[in-house]
């Protein structure tokens, strides 16, 4: 029996309730991730690879909200493995925020992860054949304003028994040659991709199989392997592809959509493609015809998946992504270069095999560690504004909103919407 859009929608929404969203502005399949809200606070107080006060130690145990009293580059040798029910709030770091450089991260079985405003840059010294970020199993995760780059296999991939994941407002960039892949998004459990930038990946921008919502993304300078690739024909896929902008770059030699088949069912609407590499943004809408979408089976009814609150036009999506995607509280040198490539509209961009071509991870202002008398993760001056006690560790108490006071403070540091 072929699954209809309405049946797929019912199945996919069984999990989706009116529960508190992960943070104001959380959307999609992963919007209800809980993170470490029912656990304890852990303050990352140094840039060490391991040991007390390190980020690696912070995420090694379940049930933690992780905040930062220091900014800068954390250089790691081995992969970081994240436990269940962990919230990582990179926007709390002083200075220019946090970059983690040198190897990748595993979120396999990291149920209920919430990750915001952090840069994960693997690099050629990372583990061979591994992703910069990967999820092989797990459920209920959301990644917001994450900048991930330089994977040695995929840059950000989701495979296996995975359900209810959102990647939003993020940058997935420069998988290293010779593989150079944006990532696989291959699960029947539901993945939402909203307002992201895929850039300088030879292929898999992304490669999709299963249940997927792909809305208001920008894809720039994919190589000969392909832009948005439809997954294999050995199983059913049911996707929405809405309001995206594809822009050819110097390395682009194939069309935006490839490898469609009769089992890849897609609802498509208002997707733009600028293919001429002339330095001017002048894309046009792809007609709703299977030949424009790599031979996908196009359906007329949109799958009723958890959607964005407001769908942008492709032009507005491009403006949004170039202004705000990635760890954009403070843009580092890498993301600044990547956005400049997009805004060259075909005249700049490169597939790379060595992050040195981008200047490496770069330098970050570490900022000044704020005074936190009770050590509960909220600086004293912020406690005064919140009405909490700077002499009592009360940051994990619940506010009337349902969030912990720690989350309320962290959420106040960044906009919930950029509309």
UniProtKB/Swiss-Prot annotation:
Cofactor: Ca(2+)
Acidic residues bias spans: 373-386
Record-annotated EF-hand domain positions: 261-296
Glycan-modified residues: 48, 164, 201, 282
GO cellular component, one term: extracellular region
Domain of life according to the entry: Eukaryota
Swiss-Prot/TrEMBL keywords: Calcium, Carbohydrate metabolism, Cell wall biogenesis/degradation, Glycoprotein, Lyase, Metal-binding, Polysaccharide degradation, Secreted, Signal
Pfam family, one: TSP3_bac
One GO-annotated biological process of the protein: polysaccharide catabolic process
Entry binding sites for Ca(2+): 274, 276, 278, 280, 285
Top-tier EC class: lyase
SUPFAM superfamilies: Pectin lyase-like
Subcellular location per the Swiss-Prot or TrEMBL entry: Secreted
Residue ranges with Low complexity bias: 363-372
Record text on cofactor binding: Binds 1 Ca(2+) ion per subunit.
Function field: Pectinolytic enzyme consist of four classes of enzymes: pectin lyase, polygalacturonase, pectin methylesterase and rhamnogalacturonase. Among pectinolytic enzymes, pectin lyase is the most important in depolymerization of pectin, since it cleaves internal glycosidic bonds of highly methylated pectins. Favors pectate, the anion, over pectin, the methyl ester.
Family: Belongs to the polysaccharide lyase 1 family.
Protein name: Probable pectate lyase C
Organism ancestry: Eukaryota, Fungi, Dikarya, Ascomycota, Pezizomycotina
